[in-house]
UniProtKB/Swiss-Prot annotation:
Disulfide bonds: none annotated. GO terms for molecular function: DNA binding; DNA ligase (NAD+) activity; metal ion binding. The active site is at residue 117. It comes from the Bacteria. It holds the Pfam family DNA_ligase_OB. NAD(+) binds at residues 35-39, 84-85, 115, 138, 172, 288, 312. Belongs to the NAD-dependent DNA ligase family. LigA subfamily. Keywords: DNA damage, DNA repair, DNA replication, Ligase, Magnesium, Manganese, Metal-binding, NAD, Zinc. The lineage of its organism: Bacteria, Thermotogati, Thermotogota, Thermotogae, Petrotogales. Its cofactor is Mg(2+); Mn(2+). Gene3D superfamilies: 5' to 3' exonuclease, C-terminal subdomain, 6.20.10.30, BRCT domain, DNA ligase/mRNA capping enzyme, Helix hairpin bin, Nucleic acid-binding proteins. This is DNA ligase. HAMAP family: DNA_ligase_A (MF_01588). Zn(2+) binds at residues 406, 409, 425, 430.
Length: 668
């Protein structure tokens, strides 16, 4: 059908506007609109493409949603080889590299460009007339695989450049540390093998055949190299980095133009010390001769360039004695082996326990109780047992085999699916499963029932007071007092008050608290916003669920299966009968001293957490923003403020200390 001219013009304007906001957010870190305003523009674009499918183009921002499933990945030849880098680990070796460079060039001085070495997956991006046409993995260096549809889902990679260039650039795709932790927690809950580190998680994600699934994992990127730089009048790596940023790519801001090898070493020392500050993994720095002409003169070997080297950080590993391997039962029945070892200090924290994930992990690494083992932090966050120090074995070490019965209740164990690695307790009445479910139900992000910690919940389960989560709402003074020692008047009153108050929690908290597999706080909010009440969610059909952004087939099936269980139906009825809120409350525009003001925070506050401060701001009629934009009215500064302070100062935004803010606007 003929598309009206004004619709075509609006469509092109929307595309350009959204890409401009993507550039400001991901490349410049300087957004000028709120998330809500961005979502409104994006939704309008989606609606236009639904109504007029002929409008849709390969560079449309809606390509980031995914939805394309491929049968496999085609092989693609690289224009020039994607070489790997030689590695060096100490100052002596980097000085040897420097001497080789000077000797080969017959020079006394060379300028270097130093970049952080992102621990991710290398990619080549090809653009034709400014539009992304192909994304290729490194592969064997000569031939890679076409992963274009998956790469299109990564928000920091532009689908259209700011100039109509035909160009190939190279860089790194990575998974942020927080996303790595989230995905591994989710996989462990599903009984799937966990990823060893963020790099493996990134590689696994990019090899998924369904781009919708890729879009759910928040990958990001940094570009750092231009193929055939002379075609764009670029003479140095520093010029290339600035050029990449100008045309729309996200570049890593932590780089240095080093005038001598001493400055290279200082840069390496600085980031070896500061790398824990970063939201992504780095495993060293990359040192490049800055001049492209000198790079050309130095050339390459068959495997690596002579003009660049990776100056690696040593991963901090500690050796300790694995005293015991305990078996832990989770809320879904998964039995997880947990290592308990002599306490060690690792990257600034004391650690003495680490998950061993599953029994396949134990077997593959031949980890035994009583071994001396090496520990490091996966993704710089989670303590992980790397493997045993076999030369220290005495023969008294004990092999831990999968249990034949539940270590807590003695019930049957097995696998729900033959494909999963997890072994589960299959007893629906297992007290340990119930205890973990209760702990989730009362937690801060769920029903937020304070005063019911793990110890008192265990006493209640052991005493038979709690058979399911709904039994919490049928506790009374007599039942709580029957627990005996340590339960005084104040404790009883506090527990009953907290339980009563929790009946009025928002619907999304209840959904999160129920323990639906694969449904966390973000998904729970999406479900609450869509269905408005629990009954509508319970009755929802598969097709309706998958229409909700962020709800894939796995989550939809998990929701349907969860609410089809007779046990769950009984629990929901008991919760209703007890007066627990089952519907989303109508949002009221709160009046207060902060009405109409957008408030942002940087640094740690002494009075409350970030989440509590956000809730406080909104309770006073204000809007809490995670980012400083030109629409921010006040930045509240706590201890150790970050870059938001500099940005707020450059925008002329009102800056207040925590004390000044609460003096003016009152405390909760």
């Amino acid at each position: 059908m003929d598309i009206p001219k004004n619709i075509k013009e609006r469509y092109e304007k929307l595309k350009a506007e959204i890409e401009e906001h993507n550039y400001r957010y991901y490349v410049l870190a300087d957004p000028i609109i709120s998330d809500q305003e961005y979502d409104k523009l994006f939704k309008e674009l989606v609606e236009l493409e639904k109504k007029y499918p002929e409008l849709k183009t390969p560079d449309s921002p809606t390509q980031r949603i995914g939805g394309i499933v491929v049968e496999g990945f085609n092989k693609v030849n690289h224009l020039i080889p994607m070489l790997s880098l030689d590695n060096t680990y100490n100052e002596e070796e980097i000085l040897d590299f420097h001497k080789r460079v000077l000797k080969n060039l017959s020079l006394n001085h060379v300028e270097y460009f130093c970049e952080l070495k992102i621990d991710g997956v290398s990619v080549a991006l090809r653009y034709t007339d400014g539009v992304l046409t192909q994304a290729i993995t490194r592969g064997d260096g000569t031939t890679g695989e076409d992963i274009t549809q998956n790469v299109k889902t990564i928000p920091s990679i532009p689908l259209r450049l700011r100039e109509n260039l035909t160009i190939e650039v190279r860089g790194e795709i990575y998974m942020p540390k927080k996303e790595f932790v989230r995905i591994n927690s989710e996989r462990e809950e599903k009984g799937l093998p966990v990823f060893a580190n963020p790099r493996n998680a990134t590689a696994g994600t990019l090899k998924l055949l369904d781009s919708t699934e890729v879009a759910k994992r928040k990958l990001s990127s940094f570009m750092y190299y231009v193929i055939f730089p002379q075609n764009y009048n670029l003479e140095t790596q520093e010029e290339a980095i600035n050029f990449l940023k100008e045309v729309g790519f996200r570049i890593n801001p932590n780089y240095k133009n080093a005038q001598d090898i001493g400055q290279v070493i200082e840069f390496w020392k600085e980031w070896n010390r500061r790398r824990k500050e970063l939201e992504y993994e780095v495993d060293g720095i990359v040192v490049k001769v800055n001049s492209f002409e000198l790079q050309r003169l130095l050339g390459e070997t068959a495997r690596s360039p002579r003009w660049a080297i990776a100056f690696k950080f040593e991963a901090e590993q500690k050796e300790t004695k694995l005293k015991a391997i305990k078996l832990q039962v989770g809320s879904t029945g998964i039995i997880t082996p947990v290592a308990e070892f002599d306490p060690i200090q690792l990257e600034g924290t004391i650690v003495k326990r680490a998950s061993l994930h599953n029994f396949d992990y134990l077997k593959e690494r031949d980890i035994r109780e009583g071994d001396y083992v090496l520990i490091e932090k996966a993704g710089g966050i989670i303590p992980q047992v790397i493997g045993p120090v076999k030369e220290k074995r005495t023969g008294e070490e004990k092999i831990i085999r999968p249990p034949e019965k539940c270590p807590v209740c003695g019930g049957k164990v097995g696998k729900i699916k033959s494909s999963e690695v997890a072994i589960r307790c299959l007893n629906p009445s297992c007290p340990e499963k119930l205890l973990r479910t209760l702990e989730n139900f009362v937690s801060r992000n769920a029903m937020n029932i304070q005063g019911l910690g793990p110890k008192i919940l265990k006493r209640m389960v052991d005493a038979g007071l709690l058979k399911d989560i709904a039994d919490l709402y049928y506790l009374n003074e007599q039942k709580i007092r029957s627990l005996g020692e340590g339960i005084g008047d104040k404790t009883v009153e506090n527990i009953l008050t907290q339980i009563e108050q929790s009946k009025n929690r928002e619907l999304d908290r209840l959904i999160n608290a129920l323990g639906i597999p694969n449904v966390g706080s973000k998904t729970a909010k999406d479900l609450a916003n869509h269905f408005k009440n629990l009954d509508s969610l319970i009755d929802a059909k598969f097709d309706e669920l998958v229409e909700i952004e962020g709800i894939g087939e796995d989550i939809a099936n998990a929701i349907i299966k969860f609410f089809s269980q007779e046990e769950v139906k009984k629990i929901v009825k008991k919760l209703k009968d007890a007066g627990v809120n089952m519907g989303k409350k109508e949002e009221e525009k709160l009046e207060g001293p902060l009405k109409g003001l957008v408030i942002c925070q940087t640094g740690a506050l002494s009075k409350m957490t970030r989440q509590e401060f956000a809730e406080y701001v909104e309770s006073k009629g204000g809007t809490f923003s995670e980012n400083v934009t030109k629409k921010t009215n006040i930045l509240v500064v706590g201890e150790n403020p970050g870059s938001k302070l500099d940005k707020a100062q450059s925008y002329g935004i009102t800056i207040m200390s925590e004390e000044e803010f609460f003096d003016k606007y009152g405390e909760s």
